[in-house]
Amino acid sequence: MILTTTNTIEGHTITAYKGIVVGEAIMGANIVRDFFASVTDVIGGRSGAYEDKLQDARTEAMAEIEERAAALGANAVVGIDLDYEVTGDSMLMVSVSGTAVTIT
């Protein structure tokens, strides 16, 4: 399965549009990690704990659109858009959407 943010795939022709596919992942962060992340923010640097959570959420959401596209008989997803949002209570939401297509 090819997943891309572009609307076309070089070297391939889109033969059928199967529909819009969406995947979401909501991840919570725990209090200990929040504390250490805030310490990192104060002294500078990157928060590895949050980066790991972000990667996990993104991977889960991408896997969802891949599964949903396959269920529609697609072999690619084009025009992928990723959105990130931090909600209350230390929740991180990643939503991914794209168009499931069949390519040759």
From Swiss-Prot:
Xref: InterPro entries: UPF0145_dom_sf, UPF0145_YbjQ-like
Domain of life: Bacteria
Pfam families tied to this protein: YbjQ_1 (PF01906)
Family of this protein: Belongs to the UPF0145 family.
Name this polypeptide is given: UPF0145 protein RD1_2695
